[in-house]
Amino acid sequence: MLQDVPKPFLRQGPASVLETERLTLRRPSFADVTAIARLANDRRIAENTKRLPHPYSQDHATAWVRASANDRRGSVFLIEHNHSPIGVVGVDWDAEEAPELGYWLGVAHWGQGFGTEAAKAAIDVAFEDGGAENLAAGARVANPASRNILEKCGFQWSGVELHRFEALGCSTPVDRFRLSRGVWSSLKNWGSSVRR
């Protein structure tokens, strides 16, 4: 219910900076290429992210930053903690079934609640600014931490599919999840991010 949404959320155009309790989410820039490549160049991340290659070079990071600069919806964010990049979160509006939430964190930042905090902020943008009615997401069956993030954000399990993972070079089972605008709205008391 939009009348219950704090005023900072009710603005036109894509968010450029989101602030949560501990994180800053902002558009990535070419100045971030080295940090992105350093964080993403870990096989454990690539094995749980469909399109992330391994090894992950600065050329990959440069191409990704260039592509995210063309994201007119402003739904791709670099996640920062204490002014240092720790990962990425965003919504793919070109996904087949519904806009799809995706994220990854550098391994040193796993298990601290950052994924859930960043995902909630990106979800808010998708529903409030993007006008999404539903969001989709997926997590490898072998990745319970990612499934936990999705469940904490209100996503509901919708089935299992096979998806190809670039770093694995094969298809692997993925739990699929959905989040409707109605469920998101009812869970909105999870706190809010502040936009600048």
State each model region's role.
Residues 44-66:
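Conserved GNAT-fold acetyl-CoA-binding loop/helix
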Residues 1-43, 47, 76-196:
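Acyl-donor (CoA/ACP) binding surface of acyl/acetyltransferases
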Residues 67-73:
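Short loop/turn motifs at secondary-structure junctions and domain boundaries
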